[in-house]
Amino acid sequence: MQEDVYRSGIRKNLNRILQELTDDGKLDFESVPYQNLKAEIEKRDEECTEVLCKVLLETASRSGCADRQFVLQLFNEYFCNSSLFRDQILNDPKEFIEIMLETDPIRNPLPGSKSEGNELKSKSLAFIKNWEKMYAKNDARMKCLAVTLRKTKFVDYENGEKKIEEERKRREFLDERRRMIVERTLSLYKSKFEEIKEDVERLKMELETTMEMLVPSFTNSDDVDIPMDIPSTSSKSFELVIEDLSPLIKVNADNDAIVEAFLGAKTVLIHRVQTMRKLAKGLLPLKGAGESLAQSIIDYRDVIKKLVLKADEIRIKTKKKPVQKAKKFDDDFIDVEISIDDILMVQYANEASEDVKEDVKEPEKKLANPKKEEPKVKFVSFGLDLKYWGEERKDVEVPKNNADCHRFWRSADESTVAGTVHDTVYTQRQFTFVGEAPKIDRECLAKLPSGALCKRKDMFKCPLHGPLVDRDANGKPVKDEDRLKEIDRKERKRLKEAEEFSRKIVKEYESKTKRKRKHEEETSVRSRLQKKLFDPKTIQRVSADITSQQRSRLEKNFSHQFSHL
């Protein structure tokens, strides 16, 4: 009973010590609870010291790594000042090293995070090494404890402190690097915001100026004071309903430039508002470091947004441009006038037909509206004179119905007498095409290998140098895109000539050595698969397997049928 009371008193003092910590996280060895525990130690009572050691171990086993570090300071203080407390620890150090150094991580692991556990281990190793220097010469138990810690595989007694120190330095280096990255990112975002802010201030001034010019304000004058309520003796009252208060601006020659500047500034400001929104969103991952900059960007964006919304209230009425109808024909084609022969042929055909009136109206409509309906291209029916054009043929024999020809309803004509065709069939017809040849006065002017310029004239394309383009006195294209096309054409021509030259060299080599040169095989996936799949042996093997599978399946399903056999 007395021992329990004594333990409860020690626990109270220990809890008060842990509660009365200093600002730097160390124990206050001048406090009253610590002096009470120290007085218990100084009594040199073995039972009291044993109870104190057990209470400290129980408190450490129930606490986290942070509180264990404070208890470890008490262990170090009492270990150095009390021989009885030192004997209690060195007689059975197993529980102490399990709690402080995690020598049995499976059954008794350290609570909390890994970083806190490593910090507790490093401090414990530092204290134990200090104990070894002080008491290892005179106390064999201290030597045994050090040897045990050196042999255990869960504690790196020699290099553990170095590794923990390296881990701490690496963590500090990473924190410093992260801080530098954050600072660099903040400076980059800040410079971007300053650039955008300069541009936005200029656009803001331009937008406000154009708004004042388009919709001037008459309320800024302080010369005339108009009272809000004017006294009147009349009993009549009027009600006015204004449907829309937003101003309407009609575009004319006087304010065209102002309206254009107003719309341009408003459009660019809308884009800048979106850019500032993206900047503020990009600063969110930086959390505390970028909150102030993000808040300033958001506040400035809201101011510009209000100005843009105010500018949106102004309605602008523009004149509708006349819609130009698209041309139905291409400009590359040339209109051909209707020839007199065509008109006469139509008239003669109309006189011979029964419906003269209906047929006469069509050419009149064509002549009256030549722009609406295009003239049809003249064509002639195909005949033997076109097939044998330029040849003189007379009394051409025509074969009879030979038996080798296909016929179904009548029998073959067995006579071998050939017939003749009338001479008029082969008489060459004459066609008159009336029209004016287009004038061609555009020269190619491309530079020839001799240094002179190509004098070939054509309408659209030179057969040697491609489409006709504008060139200067040296034969170089004037436009950049034409110059790039010219360079591309020359490069393709050079590659083609090089390929032909290499092919010619290969042929000469093969003719001299009388053996063909091995060409490089393709190394693509498709070529390798083709070589494997289309190999004759592979096809034969696969087809044999497929045939045997089909035969076995047929025999299994239809072997009992007589027709299958």
Curated annotation (Swiss-Prot):
Coiled coil segments of this chain: 155-215, 480-510
Annotated transmembrane regions: none
Residue intervals of every UVSSA-type zinc finger in the record: 441-468
Region feature (VHS-like): 11-156
Keyword flag Nucleotidyltransferase: no
Entry annotated with the keyword S-adenosyl-L-methionine: no
Region listing for Disordered, in residue ranges: 510-530, 542-565
Chief location: nucleus
Keywords: Chromosome, Coiled coil, DNA damage, DNA repair, Metal-binding, Zinc, Zinc-finger
Matching PROSITE patterns: ZF_UVSSA (PS52058)
GO molecular function, one term: RNA polymerase II complex binding
Protein family per UniProt: Belongs to the UVSSA family.
Protein role: Factor involved in transcription-coupled nucleotide excision repair (TC-NER) in response to UV damage. TC-NER allows RNA polymerase II-blocking lesions to be rapidly removed from the transcribed strand of active genes.
Protein known as: UV-stimulated scaffold protein A homolog
